[in-house]
Amino acid sequence: MKNNYLNRLKSQWIWMLSAFMLFSGLSLAQTTTITGVVRSEGDMESIPGASVLVKGTTRGTTTNLDGEFSIQASPGDVLSISFIGYATQEVPILNQTSNIEVIMVSETSDLEEVVVVGYGSQLKKEITGSVQTVTGDDLADMPVSQITQKLQGRLAGVQINQTTGKPGQGMNVRIRGQLSVSAGSQPLYVVDGFPITGGINSINPDEIEDLTILKDAASTSLYGSRAANGVVLITTKKGKAGQTNVALNYYTGFQNVPHYNRLEMMDAVEFAQFKKESYEDAGQDVPVEFQNPSQYEGKTNDWYDALLQTAPISNYNLTITSNTDKMSTAVVAGFFDQKGVVLNTDYKRYSLRLNTDYKVSDKVRVGFNLAPSYVKDNTPRTDGDRGTGILFNALHTWPIMPIYDQNGELTYYNRLGAETGNIYAYPNYVRAAKEIINENTVTNVLTNGFVQYSPIEGLTLKSTINAEIRSEDYFWFNPSTASAGINQSIPTVAVSIRQGIRDFSWLNENLATYTRSFDDHNFDLLVGYTNQHFRREVTRVQADTYADDRLPTVQGGLNINRGGTNSGVGEWALTSLLSRINYNYKGKYIVSAAIRGDGSSRFGANNRWGVFPSISAGWVLSDEAFLMDAEKLSFAKVRASLGVTGNNNIGDYTQYALVNNTVNYVFNNNVVPGAAVSSLSNANLGWETTQQFDIGLD
């Protein structure tokens, strides 16, 4: 009896304690306004423009002209404050929520940091071009799918815009603005020395050790014909000195479209009243649908809200690194899963990376990297205005039109009488979001291997072979029961599209570097020869008129659409010679010169080769005797550069004549199929070049 009483008492205490913890947690989770000021160490001057971010979230702000900030956060959150030239400070939110003073400590030791540049590395202090580096630690704990999303607002002179709000969608990156009128404007992405062709959307951000942006011609000219829009160098994780390290990183959360700042839509009663008054004001008979607005009481259909959902997001990453005297290894495995805020929208990415480096002897090193990834997404056609995007069309659908019928089933379409002014048939866009398939899968494999030999002190010979294999499959199926457009009654003609893209790219690089110092003179020389080849095969089949929507295969369509069915092959090749020399005296007076020659199959026979030189110089003023005693000046360098870069994103066969095979001829008094040249060849087609002159003060 006593034991039963004790058990009941224990259960009551556990219940009360659980309830207390639950309500305590709820109260702690409430956000409040956090205010403070950011100052510099020593002079205690305020710092305007400092970045203030709630760690682990995308909530952030910047300090005003007086160094003050205001941000929404919860007790227990951590504020991460950063500014160029200062070490990042992390401030936990405890009891104090106002007038928080953050003191930024100057970060001068990074001048001796080694920074990755084109085809090598340099001391940050000795760089004469415009270069900015972001480390993986700076970008950690941000719940986004793409590395470029993490860079927004962090890089001077780099504009990053999201093309759509769909999960996993890529970003438009512009380095120092738009530099081309007709050719491509995206920067060149180089992953572990390999200029990739398939974009970086499939790369797991947690695989990245650091990222360097090359902005001016002095820093990009070694990439020649592809560097006019800037270069992004990505270095992935390697094994670090010490014992084996294992790290598991996981986060989860939810996303939704906030009600704040949404368009305020009429409810059904307000809409019917509005229509009734408009007819009365015009002196016209009021249609029966609007004569009694109160009949729609409690029957409002918010089409926009019906298309939205609370979307979970989760990310898992396992990182294993080890480093011994002989071998360095890093393994990163990741899984990212994000639902979209629109119904039937989702994005999944599976990724794996293996980086190994083995020291065969004091003179020989070999390495191998392998990075497969698999991405699958489904995204309803939400973009566009009237007739193309379901969100826009849903906003214009009358709230008196039902989403569900009396049996609780989704309606097919709505159309009122012409006297109501409703001249279009409105398909059920909720049904369209759920039933229309817009699926894309991408399998991508990046791999490279290298052999490095150092025959004498200061001389290094390195040969690499790189390959990228990419397979993309797209499937779109619009069943007869749904439509995303307007003025389309159901059933409609079912249509399917299947498209396959197969890419293969390889690159061979052979580089020699020689570094030498004597007295206070230091120089290094780089020479190299590279070859790259790319091939793409595309196959597309479009079918329609399906007897049964449950069989959306090509064979299930009664008609193969010839206009939407095609195939093609595209290839290009690039051969290059390159060289660079860096010289400095006492690390104070710095000169650098580089040149690259590119031969591309994309250009005319008379203009196939292009030459892209650059020269730059720097003077470290802070090392001069007349500035040694300047207490508030930790580092100062003036630099200037002049160079030429190119852009070869013009298509693979622009230099050739174009033949149109849809032209008809009259032969023997009969019209017969034929072909004709629709545009002439251009053997003098050449490079689009950009000349840049820069002066900077660091």
Task: Please name every model-derived segment.
Residues 1-17, 23-353, 358-367, 371-373, ...:
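Short, small/polar-rich motifs associated with maturation and membrane association
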Residues 49, 400-403, 614:
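Hydrophobic residues in alpha-helical membrane-spanning segments
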Residues 121-127, 293-297, 422-426, 483-485, ...:
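Flexible hinge/switch segments at interdomain interfaces of large molecular machines
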Residues 139, 185-186, 314, 349, ...:
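Extracellular/periplasmic, surface-exposed regions of secreted and cell-surface proteins
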Residues 151, 488-489:
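Intrinsically disordered, low-complexity regulatory/activation regions of eukaryotic proteins
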Residues 167, 381-386, 480-481, 627-633:
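Short, glycine/acidic-rich hinge or "gate" loops at secondary-structure transitions
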Residues 256-285, 373-419, 476, 533-550, ...:
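A surface-exposed, glycine/aromatic-enriched loop/edge motif typical of exported proteins
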Residues 379, 482-484, 592:
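Core alpha/beta catalytic barrel or barrel-like domain that forms the active/cofactor pocket
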